[in-house]
A protein has these predicted regions:
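Short, small-residue-biased leader/transition segments that mark boundaries at the very start
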Residues: 1-8
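Flexible gly/pro-rich beta->alpha loop and the following alpha-helix that scaffold active-site loops
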Residues: 9-74, 87, 92, 97-101, ...
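Flexible loop residues that form catalytic
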Residues: 32, 171, 182
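Pocket-forming structural segment of enzyme catalytic cores
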Residues: 50, 87-164, 187, 201
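Conserved G/P- and acidic residue-centered "switch" motifs that form tight phosphate/ATP-binding loops
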Residues: 77
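Hydrophobic, aromatic-enriched interface-forming segments
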Residues: 80-82
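Acyltransferase
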Residues: 177-202
């Protein structure tokens, strides 16, 4: 059933995770805690926020198996960050400290409006969904993709040079975006197209 909830009793029990994944047509990695810098081999700086080790362990296993099985994966905000870190890339732990700019990355409500521009790469998977060129997106994050994971492709950049969307080109649908289409799809047809593309891939 679409959107059905699953109760995972032990997030480090791989047998239980396999059973759950076997009932899924796709994997959605949502926003939330900061990604533990240990995932990408770094020490946490003071500005790094709260992390959740159990979540990182669980999502690392689910992502690894989803990639192996070529299940559709859609990462949103923390989701794109975790995808990149778990697959071998790195993150900015705190943008104000490590990548200061005038671009608004930590907006205030309402969240269904665009606050900065991105440029979508011509010929990319994302361009096929929403079109290449300039788009306006919402933005609510303080971490971001830094060094791209091996095998991943950057599909969009913000005005200050941050990677805003990635994919794994040789997979069916493994896509991550830094913005929040789930906040804006009722008003923004491009966000709706993105959500629909994931649903269709599943």
């Amino acid at each position: 059933l679409v959107g059905s909830e699953m109760c995972i009793r032990d997030r480090e029990d791989t047998e239980e995770l396999e059973q759950c994944l076997g009932m899924c047509d796709g994997l959605l990695l949502t926003g939330g805690h900061d990604v533990d810098p240990a995932v990408y081999g770094e020490e946490a700086i003071p500005e790094c926020g709260q992390c959740c080790h159990a979540r990182d362990v669980m999502e690392a296993y689910l992502l690894k198996r989803a990639v192996e099985k070529d299940l559709p994966v859609f990462g949103i905000c923390r989701g794109i960050q975790f995808m990149n870190a778990s697959l071998g890339g790195t993150l900015y732990q705190d943008l104000d400290t490590q990548h200061p700019s005038e671009t608004e990355h930590h907006m205030t409500p309402p969240y269904d409006r665009g606050v900065h521009k991105i440029t979508v790469k011509e010929g990319s998977l994302l361009a096929g969904m929403i079109g290449a060129g300039e788009h306006s997106v919402n933005s609510y994050h303080h971490q971001a993709v830094k060094e791209l994971a091996p095998g991943a492709e950057a599909m969009a950049y913000s005005e200050d040079g941050l990677i805003e969307a990635i994919c794994i080109p040789d997979k069916k649908f493994i896509v991550g975006v830094q913005w929040h289409p789930e906040f804006a799809f009722e008003k923004d047809p491009e966000c709706l197209k993105l959500v629909q593309a994931f649903v269709d891939a599943c």
